[in-house]
Amino acid sequence: MDSDTCTVPDHFLPRKLSKQNLDRFIPNRSAMDFDFANYALTQGRKRNVDEITSASRKAYMTQLAVVMNQNRTRILAFRNKPKALLSSNHSDSPHQNPKSVKPRRYIPQNSERVLDAPGLMDDFYLNLLDWGSANVLAIALGDTVYLWDASSGSTSELVTIDEDKGPVTSINWTQDGLDLAVGLDNSEVQLWDFVSNRQVRTLIGGHESRVGSLAWNNHILTTGGMDGKIVNNDVRIRSSIVGTYLGHTEEVCGLKWSESGKKLASGGNYNVVHIWDHRSVASSKPTRQWLHRFEEHTAAVRALAWCPFQATLLATGGGVGDGKIKFWNTHTGACLNSVETGSQVCSLLWSQRERELLSSHGFTQNQLTLWKYPSMSKMAELNGHTSRVLFMAQSPNGCTVASAAGDENLRLWNVFGEPPKTTKKAASKNYLELFSHVNSLR
């Protein structure tokens, strides 16, 4: 071996790197707080020293530690939910419960069922749909009245009127839902017992032309005719006519007794609404002594609805050329509010549980509109009908609404929410599956 030459072991030679200009890795510790880390470690080694500390001071120190040492925990560490700090706002006392905010109710935009209703008359002055308290829905199609028992899901034909007497121009259930009054084009009114499916009696002599509106008040059946007369019939006695109201000069197209039975609202073709006193029901002579006369509408008034939570409040809706919903104090006669809807108001229904009002309309949208009362802000618009929605009826539980229109369709809407939990199961069968086995009313 040459003395001037030295062999260097391979492990002392520098490694051949694939990349050049590399340096050692120096981590960035700017986000690391070594002072706090040292404090946290050393504090844990200190012996606990017993000292007298008040409860308030302990609470203060705990909250101060939370504030000063926030975000100094391990990432994704499992720990208990942090305690809420006391608010600095003295009005938010721990003894006061925060005001609960009621969640907004979901309102389905589509109808639950759609049925064909061939022969349904497209006449603004008639009343051809009613849902009784016995859970039976009645609808008049031409000369025939059909019934749907929602409790059993069965359908039946109640009566077909002779051609010389028909068509049927109005229907209305008694308050117990066991008997149905049927107004006819020839001025007669028939009373039918749907349980036995037989006619009980016929009322004649009260009108000179068709009977387009009916309203029950216990044993009194009030009828409104094209002749402008409103007739009170006591169905318990042979000579049933016990009183007549005179105030409308044209057809009476809307009648509604208040829930207490003390006041009657009537709407007519001559843009007038009258409020009548029940004490003048039985009068030996026709009376023109109404309590109030409202003339603010500019079109026929068919839509009438007494408020269920305020006995003296009445909502009315005007037809084509008016399109307004008005609210009246029937004690003072004052108009409380007037809302422009933009289209013919055909029918009105109050919610039985919420402060809400449902209206049905004509051209251009033929929609149902749900309003929040008293702000009258729109909660929902329900579309589906292609012609004016003339008739609406509410189920006994107050949740489902049936609507019938000039397009010869009957639709069911779950617009007023779910039924109470105690009846939810039964209601689901009774209302949502009411027409599951039929597609047509005939």
UniProtKB/Swiss-Prot annotation:
WD repeat segments: 121-158, 163-202, 206-243, 247-286, 296-338, 340-381, 384-423
Pfam families for the chain: WD40_CDC20-Fz (PF24807)
Record has Repeat as a keyword: yes
Molecular function terms from GO: anaphase-promoting complex binding; ubiquitin-protein transferase activator activity
Compositional bias per record (Polar residues), positions renumbered to this chain: 86-99
Entry keyword set: Cell cycle, Cell division, Cytoplasm, Mitosis, Repeat, Ubl conjugation pathway, WD repeat
The UniProt record lists the keyword Repeat: yes
Record GO cellular component, one term: cytoplasm
Localization terms from the record: Cytoplasm
GO biological process terms on file: cell division; protein ubiquitination
Pathway connected to this protein: Protein modification; protein ubiquitination
Disordered: annotated segments: 85-104
Record-linked InterPro entries: Cdc20/Fizzy, WD40/YVTN_repeat-like_dom_sf, WD40_CDC20-Fz, WD40_repeat_CS, WD40_repeat_dom_sf, WD40_rpt
Subunit structure: The APC/C is composed of at least 11 subunits that stay tightly associated throughout the cell cycle.
Function of the protein: Component of the anaphase promoting complex/cyclosome (APC/C), a cell cycle-regulated E3 ubiquitin-protein ligase complex that controls progression through mitosis and the G1 phase of the cell cycle.
Family: Belongs to the WD repeat CDC20/Fizzy family.
Name recorded for this polypeptide: Cell division cycle 20.3, cofactor of APC complex
Source species: Arabidopsis thaliana (Mouse-ear cress)
